[in-house]
């Protein structure tokens, strides 16, 4: 009798789980909406089993993903109640529930992840992975919890600029893995720009033959060295491009992780690389002169539509991003074809001429069941009827679009541009400038307070942008992305009332270790210097609050508060972005105190 009892106890320990009394600290990024804990833990054994009631194809993909995870789970063919982990599709609670929601229950009897969709189960599994604390014997200790979770925003994005510096297919996949861990669901892929064309277009092979490589090792050298392109076999050629098969492979890899890839094809500006290859599409008709397409030339529209047809065949995303930013409109003012177009269409200025192009591109995309997405400059000259605005020059563009009943993705540079320095610039690798800390990213609320509840509903999400002018290596790119992307992930997913900076920072420290252990190259948050120490203390000097006379005026965008800035005893932070530095442009500083 005693022997049988011992055997039974041994079976319980080696089978589904063992209940421990040690509590486990719960740290999840992004922070779930609701976490209820019970004292004790659950031990997940080696090669524990799981079941899933997902439909066949989706279920097979999900099972393969789960089995490849560090937990070592094995798909069970037995009844689900006998499995250590059960993944269960359930009916949504009501029509307003997010399809990405999930519930994760860990009890002394096992683990149940339930959700109304495969995406929800996937995100529940990501939470389970973050909770799992590996033991030395290959088992995993898990806290007893009941987590109910759903995203705040439907769009949770990361932008990757691969024009300034090309990234390999493997690098992109690696970032998709990290995005999945932190429940981000959109990769905005900046494939074309003046620094290089990165996508194979079969109708126009010259684009990648003549504009995907540069005779310099990095963007900075190229920018200073004449900004010319070269072929792949030219001496010192640097760059690359994605074949259509490469792009499809990445799209599929992302889809299996519930990530949508949105391609960006720049127009009408940022197109030097196209116009070097096809100068007849520019206003001058000469290579290396213009950055903007000639909107008066009908061949421009033929070219763009042909390109977009191939792009849409590769990318099934609802959105196609057309850029629309930073166009230099001077050439249009002097171009006979552009002026003829303006007269024929009754356009009053060149901003309306750009809007004409955006309107035509939107109709073309809509005719192919796609939606146009563009930077906030597409507001100028009149917004296309169904366009979605990506607000980067602050929030003003997003506010204007939301008030006009247009969908908006918020990505203001002040909070979302990860190419800025993240710590003391003297201790960091080169960046474009600025100073954007983890804490500042975390502080961002994508819904401006000035919007009404009805207007705020048009804010569909938020995105981190990584422009790559000064980021030449993949290691440097990851250093700029992580851990700030984790803060953006929590901004995008977690309701504001559930956010807590100190708790998040401790969680981020843990995740930095995870990222390092898995081959990423994040900024070491444990060594963060923080704000410039001198900026925290008032300086006493003989000129304190004395009268001051400016012989040369300071720039209106760098006032630092006005005339008293130089005598108020307050010093600026690491960069002018804190609005505490007074600046003088195109003139020497001449001041008398």
Question: What is each PLM-predicted segment?
Answer:
Residues 58, 166-168, 194-200, 268-274, ...:
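Flexible loop/turn segments at secondary-structure boundaries
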Residues 274, 280-385, 392-399:
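Active-site neighborhood of glycoside hydrolase catalytic domains
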Residues 534-593:
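Disordered, acidic Ser/Thr/Pro-rich linker "stalks" and the adjacent N-terminal cap
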Residues 1-25:
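Bacterial Sec-dependent N-terminal signal peptides
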Residues 372-377, 382-387, 393-537:
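Flexible, acidic glycine-rich loops studded with aromatic residues
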Residues 95-319, 360, 364, 463-467:
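Feature activates predominantly on carbohydrate-active enzymes
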Residues 19-155, 476, 491-523:
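Contiguous, structured surface segment used for ligand recognition
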